[in-house]
Amino acid sequence: MEETIKDPPTSAVLLDHCHFSQVIFNSVEKFYIPGGDVTCHYTFTQHFIPRRKDWIGIFRVGWKTTREYYTFMWVTLPIDLNNKSAKQQEVQFKAYYLPKDDEYYQFCYVDEDGVVRGASIPFQFRPENEEDILVVTTQGEVEEIEQHNKELCKENQELKDSCISLQKQNSDMQAELQKKQEELETLQSINKKLELKVKEQKDYWETELLQLKEQNQKMSSENEKMGIRVDQLQAQLSTQEKEMEKLVQGDQDKTEQLEQLKKENDHLFLSLTEQRKDQKKLEQTVEQMKQNETTAMKKQQELMDENFDLSKRLSENEIICNALQRQKERLEGENDLLKRENSRLLSYMGLDFNSLPYQVPTSDEGGARQNPGLAYGNPYSGIQESSSPSPLSIKKCPICKADDICDHTLEQQQMQPLCFNCPICDKIFPATEKQIFEDHVFCHSL
């Protein structure tokens, strides 16, 4: 097997993983005569795109990986892949690099990833034989050849079965190898992380060691200072022991004073108890006074509420009284108006109001005794009784067609319901709405 200066890209990809149909080899002979150059013709399929480091190698039939090439040639990239002629390419192998034996070989197209994209039919490198020679064989030789052929077929089948078994084992081994490679990559990654962690830990320990050394030096210096400090504290302790003796003596004196103070405290406690009892009685008295005051305030509030209600009612009565007074004045004005109207009518009839025997009563009782339907009586009743006028002098009433002119205006006013005028806003209410009138007047006082 011969190699060039730069080896092509290969891989350990099995035959099962290759795509032999993407590059098609054309015009491949059954055998090539040794000593001459060999031209390899091939065609790219529609969806295949060649790359710069693709190559075509000559492999012995039965090869397993692309590393088992005998010789190879780099592929020439076409300028325009869309052109039909660019799909058909060729490469020439020099006679010097071709095999010298008569084994079966084949062309294989391998891409830059080391994957086989096409393979040709097998061929040989041998001289041309005389194919026109007539060979005469006996029947026994034919049977022997047939028997030998059967044995070869059987052996071929066994070899195929063995090849399939080996391919399966190889596939399992490839899967196991892939798994081991993944585990190796994982372990390498973990190893790198651990190495990095160990380095970081080492740096941390070195830093911590330096810090501990510095702390040790500081502690040694502080230890010397503490020795001096201990001597000073011992001297202070002796002084404090003497002071403690004085304090113990003073404590005894304080204890005696405390006993005396406890006795005085007991006496004061008894006095305080008596004072608390007196204070409790005073609190009860104050509470009783507060209750009495609360009761008095409630009564005062009730009286104030009652006084307010009475004042409210008084205001309402005053308002109603004023309203009635206004109504009375209005009625008196209407009465005067009616009197003037009667005088005018009497003058129209040729009578004198002062010469009438009956005057208009000024009270409601007089009017009621004369005629319950009239408020002021009939001013013409006396005239009818005193004199009997002639039929020619009697005038007809234009309203009721009576023999005398009747005062229907007064009757119409008497038949109308009594009205109430608001003394504040002069709003008029019917006599049937007396309660509404009172509420309206009361609202003005709020």
UniProtKB/Swiss-Prot annotation:
Ranges annotated as UBZ1-type zinc finger: 419-444
GO BP terms in the entry: positive regulation of autophagosome maturation; response to type II interferon; viral process; xenophagy
Q: Where is this motif: LIR-like?
A: 203-206
* Residues reported in the UniProt entry to bind Zn(2+): C422, C425, H440, H444
Region ranges (Interaction with MYO6): 395-446
Q: How does it sit in the membrane?
A: Peripheral membrane protein
Q: Does the keyword Protein biosynthesis apply?
A: no
Q: Coiled coil: which residue ranges?
A: 137-349
Output the PROSITE patterns linked to this UniProt entry.
Answer: ZF_UBZ1
What are the GO MF terms of this UniProt record?
protein homodimerization activity; zinc ion binding
Give me the ranges of the annotated region Interaction with LGALS8: 371-381
Kindly state the subunit structure of this protein. Dimer. Part of a complex consisting of CALCOCO2, TAX1BP1 and MYO6. Interacts with MYO6. Interacts with GEMIN4. Interacts with ATG8 family members MAP1LC3A, MAP1LC3B, GABARAP, GABARAPL1 and GABARAPL2. Interacts with ATG8 family member MAP1LC3C. Interacts with LGALS8. Interacts with TOM1; the interaction is indirect and is mediated by MYO6, which acts as a bridge between TOM1 and CALCOCO2. Interacts with AZI2. (Microbial infection) Interacts with Lassa virus protein Z.
The Swiss-Prot or TrEMBL record describes its family as follows: Belongs to the CALCOCO family.
Q: What is this protein called?
A: Calcium-binding and coiled-coil domain-containing protein 2
Q: Which organism is it from?
A: Homo sapiens (Human)
- Classification lineage: Eukaryota, Metazoa, Chordata, Craniata, Vertebrata
Q: Which gene encodes it?
A: CALCOCO2
